[in-house]
C-alpha cells in the first residue's frame, strides 16, 4: 500500500464527515461530481446513517454525490465494494509482467455504469486501488452475448434449375428406396 497524500480539501471533507458520522475515515477520493469515503470493514452502515442521513447531510454540504466504500484486505472483495451496487460477474487479480492487474468480467448491460462518463468511474476505481493495494491496472472484460451468424454453405437464394435438379435427385433416391423395399 502506497502512502496516501491528502489535499487540504480532502482533509477538510474527511474532518466534516467524521464529525457527522462518528466513524473513522481511511481515505477520501474526489472528482468533479463525487466524493468517495473509504471506511473500515463493518463501518458502512454507521457511515451512511439512519435512512442515509449522514450521506444526505454531506451531499448538501459538498454539493456533490457522496459514496461510501468499505475497505477490505481481500482485494477482490475491495474491488466489488468500489463498484457496488453494480453486479460484477467475476473479479480476479493477476501479475502481468511488472504490473498487478485487476480483471473485471461484466455483463454488457452494466458496461456504461462500470466505465462511467468518459471513463471517470474506472479512473476513480484505479486511483483508489493504487492508494490501497499494489494493483496498477484494471482490465474490463465484457461478456459477448451476441452470437455471430455463420455463413450459409450454400447460397440462400436458389435458381430454378438448381431446385429442379435437387427435386429430381430426391425423387430418384425415393424410387431407389421403394424398389429395394419391394425386393
Curated annotation (Swiss-Prot):
Residues 32-98 form the KH domain. GO terms for cellular component: cytosol. Its main location: cytoplasm. It is found in: Cytoplasm. Keywords: Cytoplasm, RNA-binding, Transcription, Transcription regulation, Transcription termination. Gene3D superfamilies: 3.30.300.20. Residues 149-183 are annotated as: Disordered. CDD domains: KH-II_NusA_arch_rpt2. InterPro entries: KH_dom, KH_dom-like_a/b, KH_dom_NusA-like, KH_sf_prok-type, NusA_arc, NusA_bac. GO terms for molecular function: RNA binding. Residues 156-183 have a biased composition (Basic and acidic residues). GO terms for biological process: DNA-templated transcription termination; transcription antitermination. Pfam families: KH_5 (PF13184). Belongs to the NusA family. Participates in transcription termination. This is Probable transcription termination protein NusA. The gene is nusA.
Amino acid at each position: 500500500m502506497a502512502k496516501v497524500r491528502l489535499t487540504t480539501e480532502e482533509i477538510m471533507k474527511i474532518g466534516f464527515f467524521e464529525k457527522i458520522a462518528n466513524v473513522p475515515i481511511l481515505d477520501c477520493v474526489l472528482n468533479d461530481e463525487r466524493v468517495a469515503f473509504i471506511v473500515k470493514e463493518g463501518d458502512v452502515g454507521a457511515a451512511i446513517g439512519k435512512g442515509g442521513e449522514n450521506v444526505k447531510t454531506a451531499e448538501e454540504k459538498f454539493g456533490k454525490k457522496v459514496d461510501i466504500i468499505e475497505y477490505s484486505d481481500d482485494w477482490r472483495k475491495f474491488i466489488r465494494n468500489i463498484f457496488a451496487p453494480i453486479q460484477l460477474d467475476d473479479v480476479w487479480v493477476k501479475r502481468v509482467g511488472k504490473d498487478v492487474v485487476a480483471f473485471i468480467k461484466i455483463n454488457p448491460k452494466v458496461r456504461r455504469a462500470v466505465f462511467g462518463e468518459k471513463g471517470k468511474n474506472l479512473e476513480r476505481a484505479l486511483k483508489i486501488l493504487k492508494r490501497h493495494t499494489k494493483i496498477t491496472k484494471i482490465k474490463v472484460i465484457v461478456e459477448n452475448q451476441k452470437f455471430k451468424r455463420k455463413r450459409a454453405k450454400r447460397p440462400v437464394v436458389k435458381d430454378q434449375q438448381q431446385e429442379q435438379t435437387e427435386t429430381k435427385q430426391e425423387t430418384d433416391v425415393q424410387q431407389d428406396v421403394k424398389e429395394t423395399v419391394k425386393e
